[in-house]
Amino acid sequence: MKEISESYVPAVVENEVREYWKANNTYRETRKLHESGKPWLFVDGPPYTTGYIHLGTAWNKILKDAILRYHSMTGQHIIERAGYDMHGLPIEVKVEEKLGFKNKADIEKYGVAKFIEECREFALTHKDLMSEQFKDLGTWMDFDDPYQTVDKGYIEAAWYTLKRCEEEKMLERGSRVVNWCPRCGTAIADAEVEYWDETDPSIFVKFPIQGTENEYLVIWTTTPWTLPANVAVAVGEEFVYAKCRAVKDGKSEDLWIAKELAEQILKYGKYQDYSIIETKTGAELAGTKYISPLASAVPMQAQIEHRVVIADYVAMENTGMVHIAPGHGWDDYLVGLKENLPAVCPVDGNGNFTDEAGIFAGKYVKAPETNQEVIDVLGDAMLAVRKITHRYGHCWRCKTPIIYRATSQWFLKVKDIREKMLEEIADEVTWYPEWAGSARFHDWVEEARDWCISRQRYWGIPIPVWVCPVCNKYHVVGRYEELEQLSGQKMTDPHRPYVDDITIPCECGGTMKRIPDIFDVWYDSGIASWATLRFPEKPEDFGKYWPADFILEGHDQTRGWFYSQLALSTIAFGKAPYKSVLMHGFALDAEGKKMSKSLGNVIAPEDVAKQFGVDVMRQYILSANAPWDDMRFSLEGVKTNHRMFNVLWNVYKFPLPYMALDGYKPAAKDGVWDPSAVEDHISEFCREDRWLISRVNSLAEQVTKEMEVCNLHRATRPISTFILDELSRWYVQLVRPRMWLEEESVSKMQAYDTMYYVMRRLVTIFAPFAPHITECMYQNLRCEGDLPSVHMVDWFSGNDALRDPVLEEEMEIVQEFDEAVANARQNGKRKGRWPVGTVVVATDSEKVAGAVSAMNDMCCDRANARTVTVVKGVWDKLDWTAVPVMKVIGKQFGRDGPKVKAFIEEANGTKLKALLTADGKVSMEKDGFTAELTEEHMTFEEKMPENIFSSPMENGTIYVDVTLTPELEAEGYSREVIRRIQEMRKQAGLAVDAKIKAEVVIDDARVMPLVDSKHDVIETEVRANCLKIRVPDGETCSCRVADEAILAMDWEIDDLKVRISISKAE
């Protein structure tokens, strides 16, 4: 062991440690060390390789790294690879922005092959960039051989999985309504739709009832552009609808509206009067035929038989009648299936009306002017036009408003396996927290729809389906070898457009061509748990390690990665792909707002790490809150943790100079640290040593318990508390005098052994959370034959034989006593360095009395008191003041109440309390009025004797007598002088064992002799072999300090002027 730098400089520590890891290949060697251990498969949820990581990504990787390090140290064989999602719109949109493209037409014009190569380069470049950022967080994962969704082996795993879906008859092609991004020209998943508020028209339209005059159904919609695709009107089966004869400008119309909504709707339409002439239920209205008010503008509408249908999702709001366009809404689509309605969709992939939309053909449906044009064409059919602000969906990548559009797609029939999926997540998966699975994820799976896996884009895994245009037969290819055998062609790259050139002869004589679609990017990552094991290419690892033991991602992945994995695994293998899942929250700013550039509240993880250090950031992030709660990131919280790390460094640094002076070496066998030297002799150690050793073992047990259930916040917080409160503020203060002893001492050696033992255990416990500083400390502490890294050391879960719960409880009481004494001293304006004569502990608690009595010497030392005395109950030196309870007195004694009040206030409160305690009552007489009083008539307040100050502690009260005697004053001043000389030694850069000469000039003839009476004590404490204490006009110092002084300083000690000079002794 060697002495270390004075201050903790995170950047220096972390850079040196990373260089050490790199030079010694520590990550690989650590994994290799545990290859014979129990396998533990972790699958990294793959981030998109789109740019710099943000605070949420950093939190995610820090959580993963802490858990991986913990499981590695427990001796498990960790199987993991970093993962990257490198396909899909996240990459494509970034490349389109780079190339200045606005839509798919620009890509086609540029060339699909060139665009694919741009995407590949972008993804690989940013993968490398992100890997370095993750490494800078101290993350240990296999970044040299990550799983990448662009790799041939990974893509083959995706093909294999689809083949399994086809074999299980779970693959289906058909026309259904999907979320559609008109800019990207593709279907997108529900999980990829982002919602925010937008303002749209809110219109009420009159649909003429067939075969009537001036009789209408009144519908409401916020999407006028969908009216050219209207085929029906939905009503609530049991709702009551009114036929309202409404009058406006002298003309009347018969309008069908939900009865309880009619008055408000007619006000919107500015009708002057109305009467209800008929009512019907929705069931009675069902089947009513009507005519589209757009029949002349949209010829297709004239060919449709429009009618009223029943739908269970119709709400009693607006008009109570819903316009149905099965080609433009999922709920509408389901109604259409039930009622056999046509799903017309006169909108193309770019979001423009087709020729089927008549006069609207060619117009972009989400343009405000298009909605307005539809409104204008409706003309007299418009009852009212209003505005509404509501949540509307947008593409997650390009932020374009989505549309719902019926298109031909490929689906996995997830609805058919919902019950199996629910069984798996309930019975086979452990969730952290439990409600992540039983509530949030359960609810999502329970409502799962068939999964549209096809996307009409370019950069992705091509769907391995070849279709014959002659007979319409299709074939799903599961392996590259299979494709080459069927086609007779060699495949070099499974991406578009290269794979598109491969054709397969069909049995009918036609030529099968691959469909142009690629997989939904969620399909890509959904196969990660077996693709990372290189299955099906290398099936042996799949058989040994799958399913994954653990995965961890944010709560948005209940709709994303957790779900896509479960769906594909259940179809392909009949079971969940993971055994346990930790769901974490989102990273927000300190006020709970989402971080965004527009708000100016973005905090970059690299900036935090640069200012405070990676380990500090990790400890803050891990301890700030439960992993599954959203984290309100606070720089103040980071600063607090930074102070804790400085304290840890100082505690670690504290004994090293003394150990070096004494040539201390920890016990070792064959060069390996031997903790049994402490463990076998623990009973011989001082009480505070045994306590600290017990506490670090209790800490290890607690951290282990919390890590086993993913309570990382409850694992990390006690470590901070241990460092700050138990190591620094308590043990180091207790043991400091023993470290200063110059002579050989068993007690001093035991203090060294204790500090070494505790620091070795602490760096092990703290290693998963703060990997750099613990490695740095370990490298200095370790014995020659110890393992080369703290991260290779076996996890320490505590030694129960070294735990002493009784001693821990007693010491906790003494710590509470210490805090209470400090508070009482503060009240009495007596600093801790100044001794006091007496401290009294008044308590009814046997545990408090026992602890203070058993550790009386420690209590005296900590209180800086001559004596510490325990009294049972109330201290008899206290006086009491009686306070009348006027609320009770006034109610009972009425006009005589003032006499009772005066009696209580004038009486000796101490005697009154004694009488009440003895008899439960006291007789009074005042101005001829007599009565009996009880404790309900008065309360008592302590009346302190002079110079006595109190403070409560749990189950007791502390009383401190701050009266100064000459002896106490002498000791107080001497301690003040000692502290100043020690500070000057430090400023002068003197070694711990360096001898000095010192002169203390005190500007007070009364105080100087008091200080001089402690001459020998001061001389010993400051390691002076010559000390002179005098007043300014006294004799010249025989030590000749003033002439040789290396440092001279003026001090004020409670208004006392003191000049101190020190020089090196010869």
Swiss-Prot record:
Cofactor annotation: Zn(2+)
Pfam family, one: tRNA-synt_1
Short sequence motif 'KMSKS' region: positions: 594-598
NCBIfam families in UniProt: ileS
Cellular localisation: Cytoplasm
Domain writeup: IleRS has two distinct active sites: one for aminoacylation and one for editing. The misactivated valine is translocated from the active site to the editing site, which sterically excludes the correctly activated isoleucine. The single editing site contains two valyl binding pockets, one specific for each substrate (Val-AMP or Val-tRNA(Ile)).
Residues of the signal peptide: none
Reactions catalysed according to its record: tRNA(Ile) + L-isoleucine + ATP = L-isoleucyl-tRNA(Ile) + AMP + diphosphate
Subunit composition and interactions: Monomer.
Positions with a binding annotation for ATP: K597
EC number(s) reported in the record: 6.1.1.5
Entry's Gene Ontology cellular component terms: cytoplasm
UniProt KW Plastid keyword: no
Name of the protein in its database record: Isoleucine--tRNA ligase
Highest taxon in the source lineage: Archaea
Family annotation (HAMAP family): Ile_tRNA_synth_type2 (MF_02003)
Keywords: Aminoacyl-tRNA synthetase, ATP-binding, Cytoplasm, Ligase, Metal-binding, Nucleotide-binding, Protein biosynthesis, Zinc
UniProt xrefs under InterPro entries: aa-tRNA-synth_I_CS, aa-tRNA-synth_Ia, Anticodon_Ile_ABEc, Ile-tRNA-ligase, Ile-tRNA-ligase_type2, M/V/L/I-tRNA-synth_anticd-bd, Rossmann-like_a/b/a_fold, tRNAsynth_Ia_anticodon-bd
Family affiliation: Belongs to the class-I aminoacyl-tRNA synthetase family. IleS type 2 subfamily.
Species of provenance: Methanocorpusculum labreanum (strain ATCC 43576 / DSM 4855 / Z)
PROSITE patterns in alphabetical order: AA_TRNA_LIGASE_I
Single GO term (MF): ATP binding
